[in-house]
Every structure is written in structure tokens, then in C-alpha cells.
């Protein structure tokens, strides 16, 4: 008695069709399909940007460096 029979489902579908009509339901399904396509396209765009690696930066250890400032007071001062 707690489960819905086939007659319950037929009545529910009939009420939905009467309230929304054929045109609104098909428009709604078209909007849902368009949203799914847009979502999938967004996922594919994200994957394309994720696949593109950043350029590798190399460090040249033998490159000349700028002269470091020299300290003139080498010793410690006693107080």
C-alpha cells in the first residue's frame, strides 16, 4: 500500500503535462541539454590548459654575478 502503482504514475504524468504543456517541457529539456554541453565544453577547456606545461627555466651556475658589497669592519667591537 505504501508503493506507488502504475495508475499513480499516470495521474502524476497527466498533471505535469497539463500544468506545463508540451512546449514548456521540450523547452526545458533543450535548456538542460544546452547546459550539459556547456559544462562539458568547460571541462575540455580546463583539460587543454592543464595539459600545456610551463616552459622550463634553467639556472646557469657559472653566470657572472654582480659584485657583492664588501665589509670594512671585519672585527668585533668589545663593549
From Swiss-Prot:
Q: Where is the composition biased (Basic and acidic residues)?
A: 43-60
Region (Disordered) residue ranges read 43-79
Could you tell me the membrane topology recorded for this protein?
A: Single-pass membrane protein
Q: Which UniProt keywords apply?
A: Cell inner membrane, Cell membrane, Membrane, Protein transport, Translocation, Transmembrane, Transmembrane helix, Transport
What organism is the protein native to?
A: Rhodopseudomonas palustris (strain BisB5)
Write out the GO biological process terms: protein transport by the Tat complex
- Top-rank taxon: Bacteria
Pfam families (UniProt xref): TatA_B_E (PF02416)
Subunit comment for this entry? The Tat system comprises two distinct complexes: a TatABC complex, containing multiple copies of TatA, TatB and TatC subunits, and a separate TatA complex, containing only TatA subunits. Substrates initially bind to the TatABC complex, which probably triggers association of the separate TatA complex to form the active translocon.
Task: List the protein's name.
Answer: Sec-independent protein translocase protein TatA
UniProt GO molecular function: protein transmembrane transporter activity
Task: Give the primary localization class.
Answer: membrane
Transmembrane helix found in the keyword field? yes
Q: Which residues cross the membrane?
A: 1-21
Any one annotated GO CC term: TAT protein transport complex
User: Which PANTHER family is this protein grouped with?
Assistant: SEC-INDEPENDENT PROTEIN TRANSLOCASE PROTEIN TATA
State the Gene3D superfamilies in the record: 1.20.5.3310
What compartments host this protein?
Cell inner membrane
**Family, as annotated:** Belongs to the TatA/E family.
* Cross-referenced InterPro entries: TatA/B/E, TatA/E
Question: Which purpose does this protein serve, as stated in its record?
Answer: Part of the twin-arginine translocation (Tat) system that transports large folded proteins containing a characteristic twin-arginine motif in their signal peptide across membranes. TatA could form the protein-conducting channel of the Tat system.
